[in-house]
Amino acid sequence: MSDHNTKVALLILDGLGYGKDDNSNAVKAAQTPFLDQLLATYPHAKLNASGEAVGLPEGQMGNSEVGHMNLGAGRVVFQELGRINKAARELVFEQDPTIQSAFQYAQANHKKVHFMGLLSDGGVHAHINHLMALCDAAKTAGLTSEQVFIHAFLDGRDTDPNGGISYVNALNEHLQQSTGTIASAIGRYYAMDRDNRWERVQEAYNLLTQGIGIPSEDLLASIKESYSQGVTDEFVKPIVMVDAKGKPKATIQEGDVVICFNFRTDRGREITIALTQQEFPEYQMKPLSLHYVTMTAYDETFKNVQVIFQKENLTQTLGQTLAEHNKTQVRIAETEKYPHVTFFFSGGREEEFEGERRILIPSPKVATYDLQPEMSAHGITDAICKDMVAHQPDFICLNFANPDMVGHTGVFNAVVQAVQTVDGCTQKVVETGLENGYSFIILADHGNSEYMINPDGSINTAHTTNLVPCILIDKRFSHIKDGKLGDVAPTVLQLLGLPKPEEMTGDALAY
């Protein structure tokens, strides 16, 4: 069945799932003549992109990191969330050598311990249960609430935009029988930037190291005050907890222990760089000498950062398999999703494979993407159309970020525009590709834009557990089976006429 001249393009419409036919669905509200035509003309299927099908706990929504990892690996990749949940449940933190040596260092040197990360049960970047387990481990190790401090990054993106209060309440309740004192809070917009907006990171750095923020003796009251001004969790300005004399309860000082409990790597990197790796004189940020620990390996090049859970290396991913068969490949995305089509799609590998090229189109510099819902989709489209004609790479992995990134803003009309932009851009890419001998697999990595409004009328900014579409354009195959994201790489190899490595346990879906 193989035709060795076949070339395959995988188009990932990020965050575009199957939703209900109602007014919560921005995909349905959008004019998508091209996608409608594809669904009417070509074989298509539904893929599972959440929960155990992608290596997450049952019922856990998918996300881009997990999605691209499964897409590229061709198997179910068991995710950090599942591993760390198990460790937290089984009290592994109380014996973990990295955590215990950090606690022992703090005790021996009379230093503070700071737990820092996203206060949320979204399970995308972090989980409040992991923080609670760390607090319990600190208590078991003999540390007190005068030694252990928590710097909470508020979510509102993978969770309800006004959910921060309930997480602070849950944490406070837990701390009554555990160890730890909340020292500060700030929206993830500042503390968890991933787009080199160092002026945002600076707000978090100044809060953490100097206690610069809105002074507060009552965190819940301060967050409620923020809500009353229309500022939701994600964007909450720095809040510093102070004592009766107005002095910050704790800031990160030279020699302290910092444990960053976010397990997803991409949004933990910049604050870690500022605190430990690199000076930014123009933002008055310089690294401190810290005993710094991260839940997972944020970056292999970081110096003097200890890691609790090392990455399990994935071999024989799609990228590696293509390279071993001397195939050329292109990975293309805008800044927001560039790590996903490169690092995550390659199973956690930073460097290119032999025959791989990468095209990065900068994301627009706007405060939030509802202000520019087309993002950089047109730039991606122009670049890949030129590349298909000029270089004819054997495989293309392309990501359109719009339905996800604009979906996270919760601005319904902007999401509609985002989806319409992607429909038009997909048309140009497919038409150019068909003229140049490409087959296509068009799918999403998880849902988001198809569910924008909750039953109570409130805005939903988070991902979903919905199934995602998978459209096959290849004249040799008239059918495609339902499956999971981990079945996509074997299907790409099937279209290319290449054997599937035994590490890829997913199934080829075309027939």
Predicted regions and their residues:
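Feature captures the catalytic ectodomains and active-site-proximal regions of enzymes
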Residues: 1-511
